[in-house]
Amino acid sequence: MKIVVDGMGGDYSPHIVVKGCIEAIKEYNNIDIIITGPEKLINDELQKYEYNKEKITVLDAKDVITNNEHPVMAIRRKKESSIYKALQMMKNKEADAVISAGSTGAFLAGATLVVGRIKGVSRPALAPIMPGKNGPFMIIDCGANAECKPSNLVQFAKMGEIYFENILNVKNPTVGLINIGSEEEKGNELTKEAHKLLKDMDFNFVGNVEPRDIPTGNTNVLVCDGFVGNTVLKMYEGVASTIFETLKDEIMSSFRTKIGGLLLKPVFKKFKKDYDYKEYGGAAFLGVDGICIKAHGSSDDKAFKNAIKQAINFYENGIIDKIKSHIEQKMI
């Protein structure tokens, strides 16, 4: 399996990207990695490590797309950028998966324009796996489509169900619609119409899910438009960060609380690990005709290694072909 990684994507590129790739090839011997970016800069980073040099190659890309640029215009103009060249390899069947921690807008726009959608998919959707109290869950869409039709949400649900069932090995995962109330008649026109369609599909549909119930993880696949999904995602990350920081401040506030914190250290350590996004790698961009994983902008080497693991699972489980099969059978 060949995986192409955007070497200039993320807050700590290229050194963290390179480190994550090297850790991945040491753990997974069935992959080869191509890193896109300024050749000298990437090679200088690679020289800091001992590794099998046959497993990692560099594709020179002199340009970088930043978060401040207009995504579509940047993709169209900067064809020497690390993101564009990575996606072009996928388009040309020179790679089996693409991973980037760079500009989300540019990556999603590029995946849609360069790689292209699966025939029959109206809108690709971003689908991160999130940590929950009773197990991980997925939110789809998380920012690719701010405005949607009810039929889009039905496709999101099916693609999410296929991915969740195969990647997390959960048979017949539950599917819920994020809404302001659990009652069927609650919500706006989008959610009301989507609810009608979803309950008639072959999903394990559990109905509307209120935001307060999202963190439980009781519902496996949570469906919404990209505006709602991105808002929930960022709030979730912010709340988790605030809780950790507040606990840390309180524990360090006195000698007595420091002793208590020391006794509870194993509990806090497990809690932090369970709610660490690095454990889940990145968000799959479902609906494009190739494996595209969007890693978090602040990903460290562990997160990159796990994003690569995620791409391997995606490939080995044949998710793209399974989505295509459902579409051909007019099941979504």
Curated annotation (Swiss-Prot):
One of its GO terms (cellular component) is cytoplasm. It catalyses: a fatty acyl-[ACP] + phosphate = an acyl phosphate + holo-[ACP]. The lineage of its organism: Bacteria, Bacillati, Bacillota, Clostridia, Eubacteriales. GO terms for biological process: fatty acid biosynthetic process; phospholipid biosynthetic process. Keywords: Cytoplasm, Lipid biosynthesis, Lipid metabolism, Phospholipid biosynthesis, Phospholipid metabolism, Transferase. It comes from the Bacteria. Belongs to the PlsX family. This is Phosphate acyltransferase. It comes from Clostridium novyi (strain NT). It is found in: Cytoplasm. Pathway: Lipid metabolism; phospholipid metabolism. InterPro entries: FA_synthesis (IPR003664), Phospholipid_synth_PlsX-like (IPR012281). Catalyzes the reversible formation of acyl-phosphate (acyl-PO(4)) from acyl-[acyl-carrier-protein] (acyl-ACP). This enzyme utilizes acyl-ACP as fatty acyl donor, but not acyl-CoA. SUPFAM superfamilies: Isocitrate/Isopropylmalate dehydrogenase-like. One of its GO terms (molecular function) is phosphate:acyl-[acyl carrier protein] acyltransferase activity. Homodimer. Probably interacts with PlsY. Its EC number is 2.3.1.274.
